[in-house]
Amino acid sequence: MAQTLLKVDNINVFYGNIHAVKDVSFEVNEGEIVTLIGANGAGKSTTLKTISGLLHPKTGDVLYKGKSIKGVRAHKIVEAGLAQVPEGRHVFLHMTVEENLDMGAYTQPASTIAPNKEKVFELFPRLKERRKQLAGTMSGGEQQMLAMGRAIMSAPKLIVMDEPSMGLSPVLVQEVFSIIGTMHELGITILLVEQNAKMALAIADRAYVLENGRITMSGGARDLLHDDKVRKAYLGA
């Protein structure tokens, strides 16, 4: 039986007086791609920020490999093997591609940096071609690849991705999702937050639907892909 890598246990998260995430619980098992889908403002990004240690739940808990990471600093969570690809990419614009990748490896032994970088360059040949280019001069799609590559540099067991298709052309969206599939084949477990519900459900094993801060549906991704309520609300069908 696959190990439960991540367990979100009945968390409640507030922004001031705004109750953004309400009694949310779900699990991500080793080897899975799990997706959270929902409209803008549903609480998806807030949930990911809570998992990554950028926000703290008022009640409830977040467990990684069976241990609570509630209140643990974000960089310690990365050291434990849980990396994030944030919404909007957030690459270091005035640093080169290679320097950005090196920043992703700050928690790793020096001996692992070169082999991990080669793994990234195999996944993203364009990054290898542009390794000396400033990140700020790259296209949005290239910056997204760099953000994903930087996460891989920390040798994670689990990567949480926040809206990786945001702002990208349809062609680049296809490319990014293809790369997510390849990352999964390399043994990386993935928690994916994505507004493009059709693409997310097509690639995921399981899915949860967030509405107004609550999980309203869950199940196999293929089942939800063909569910009439999901199709009407999120797939334009």
Q: Where in this protein do the model-derived segments appear?
A:
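Glycine-rich phosphate-binding loops of nucleotide-dependent enzymes
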Residues: A2-A237
